[in-house]
Amino acid sequence: MLLLPRCPVIGRIVRSKFRSGLIRNHSPVIFTVSKLSTQRPLLFNSAVNLWNQAQKDITHKKSVEQFSSAPKVKTQVKKTSKAPTLSELKILKDLFRYIWPKGNNKVRIRVLIALGLLISAKILNVQVPFFFKQTIDSMNIAWDDPTVALPAAIGLTILCYGVARFGSVLFGELRNAVFAKVAQNAIRTVSLQTFQHLMKLDLGWHLSRQTGGLTRAMDRGTKGISQVLTAMVFHIIPISFEISVVCGILTYQFGASFAAITFSTMLLYSIFTIKTTAWRTHFRRDANKADNKAASVALDSLINFEAVKYFNNEKYLADKYNGSLMNYRDSQIKVSQSLAFLNSGQNLIFTTALTAMMYMGCTGVIGGNLTVGDLVLINQLVFQLSVPLNFLGSVYRDLKQSLIDMETLFKLRKNEVKIKNAERPLMLPENVPYDITFENVTFGYHPDRKILKNASFTIPAGWKTAIVGSSGSGKSTILKLVFRFYDPESGRILINGRDIKEYDIDALRKVIGVVPQDTPLFNDTIWENVKFGRIDATDEEVITVVEKAQLAPLIKKLPQGFDTIVGERGLMISGGEKQRLAIARVLLKNARIMFFDEATSALDTHTEQALLRTIRDNFTSGSRTSVYIAHRLRTIADADKIIVLDNGRVREEGKHLELLAMPGSLYRELWTIQEDLDHLENELKDQQEL
């Protein structure tokens, strides 16, 4: 429904657009006549909506007609194959490179010292039951026998018992202390390399991932490295060594029967543990997926807090978050239940073996083949074996879980870096303006939807060039391609006559400055956000660019000045202040190519004009190549060159007056609509004054 007011200007504009077929399929809009002064924002915004709809209809008319007349093609949905998993041995092999790094003798010496302390601790630990046996046997004699050993000898045996036990603990703790630096360095190196690899991946990869799940996976992966190293160095290797020594002692001291029971127990215990843990693994994977999903929902909701409040969707997101938590709860219940089954089975196997060995030992004592000290030795050795056996089960479970967590982390490192340097990259010439040329460039974010279609144009060096067109015509895509966030599917992009793929990526991006529509800010101080433009800038340079960007008045009003925290994504400051901060940041970078990606589209007219004056004062023509991506044509009317995009192709090129004089010009149609809206706004101002 569209109610026309008595205002002749409004009626004339709207009726003319209906007659020309420029406005259709519009959303219901209501213009009110009474209380015009209080309804001006509603009226003007409604008019802007009409213009946006008209603009879309003009620029997409041909493509819609072509689509409606084109034969329909059936699309086939490809089944996604299951992502290959990294083998556990491959993960351990990759991790070993950080424990035994090439050329780092200091780390290797630490590993060897830790290994020596480990062996010493276990040898002393095995000696403890022997000293205990000797003490028991020396007490089980007739004290009136003149051949009885002196009490001092017994005391020495007890002293050796204590020294062996304390020495075992001491060497074990020293091993932990020596190896701690090796483990932490490995964790730091893997985490840093993973972070650096992720920063090399293309923008498309990052946009297709949920940040919450990604950060949670990295956090679990780094913790998994610590757990794997702890399991391997502090448990698996010591346990294996101790079990081998104990089995050898039992075989040598008490015969093949004890050895057979020990071997059978170890074999059955290991098989049961491995099989059951493998069965439990998919429960842990399901729990991790649910945990990632819950973290992503929570993070997205908190980041988009304002949007949640705008649409009153707290309950919807709470239900969504609760659903993820319910899935995580169900998976964790299965993990706990399967853990109880595993623990019960392990204890049953060990208790059965211990009972059998104690029965055989008691039979030997009754038959006179073994002493009471031997029985105590068997009991101590078996119980001493039970400790590493119990650890073996729990450690193996933790090891499997950690390997699952590490699998995701290491798979992140396997993602291919698509945007790479040439074998011998070139450096860009310094202190000269750059021209940019697109030669038959075709690109799309999805294979079935091309954004740029065989686009060719030139942005002359030192000129102020504007790129205009409807939403989705490819304006911002041009920036992403020049910056090499993506590479074109076909065609070439040249800077000063050379393909940008020949240039060093860091050098290329160093000469390009960007003032985006939505300024990305860190949850840090104003000072740090400005200095992010060039980390090595001096304090004087930062203050200078802040003054040039007219950000100084704001900073003087703030109680904490430069130390004011801007909040998450800069939510604590206004849109105009964010844009001024972005300009200050780019001024500090001092780039030779400047992109303004609809930098003022979200601002009011007063703030927009102030920012445009700031931009004109600091980015004069001739000194830099500047590219303005804009919807509001008045902001770029003074451009040296205007490129009009339509459905991914270059529709028109020229200066403002040339394009207005061109018959059937799309630019002229868009300009006329905007001028009518501006005239409408002026009429409304006049009526308000009356």
Swiss-Prot record:
Q: What is the effect of changing R216Q?
A: Decreases ATP hydrolysis. Decreases transporter activity
Mark the transmembrane ranges: 111-132, 156-179, 229-252, 254-274, 341-359, 375-396
Q: How does it sit in the membrane?
A: Multi-pass membrane protein
Q: Report the EC code(s) recorded for this entry.
A: 7.-.-.-
The residues listed in the UniProt record as binding glutathione, with positions renumbered to this chain, are R280, T281, H282, F283, R284, N343, S344, G345, Q346, G393
Q: Which InterPro entries match?
A: AAA+_ATPase, ABC1_TM_dom, ABC1_TM_sf, ABC_transporter-like_ATP-bd, ABC_transporter-like_CS, P-loop_NTPase, Type_1_exporter
Sequence ranges assigned to domain ABC transporter in this UniProt record? 436-672
Q: Which GO terms describe its molecular function?
A: ABC-type transporter activity; ATP binding; ATP hydrolysis activity; ATPase-coupled transmembrane transporter activity
Compartments reported by the entry: Mitochondrion inner membrane
Q: Which UniProt keywords apply?
A: ATP-binding, Membrane, Mitochondrion, Mitochondrion inner membrane, Nucleotide-binding, Transit peptide, Translocase, Transmembrane, Transmembrane helix, Transport
**GO CC annotations?**
mitochondrial inner membrane; mitochondrion
Q: Which PROSITE patterns match?
A: ABC_TM1F, ABC_TRANSPORTER_1, ABC_TRANSPORTER_2
The family database entries (PANTHER family) matched by this protein are listed as: ATP-BINDING CASSETTE SUB-FAMILY B, IRON-SULFUR CLUSTERS TRANSPORTER ABCB7, MITOCHONDRIAL
Give the function comment from the record.
Answer: Performs an essential function in the generation of cytoplasmic iron-sulfur proteins by mediating the ATP-dependent export of Fe/S cluster precursors synthesized by NFS1 and other mitochondrial proteins. Hydrolyzes ATP. Binds glutathione and may function by transporting a glutathione-conjugated iron-sulfur compound.
Query: How the protein assembles, per its UniProt entry?
Result: Homodimer.
What the record says about family reads: Belongs to the ABC transporter superfamily. ABCB family. Heavy Metal importer (TC 3.A.1.210) subfamily.
Name used for this protein in its record: Iron-sulfur clusters transporter ATM1, mitochondrial
| Biological source species | Saccharomyces cerevisiae (strain ATCC 204508 / S288c) (Baker's yeast)
This protein's encoding gene = ATM1
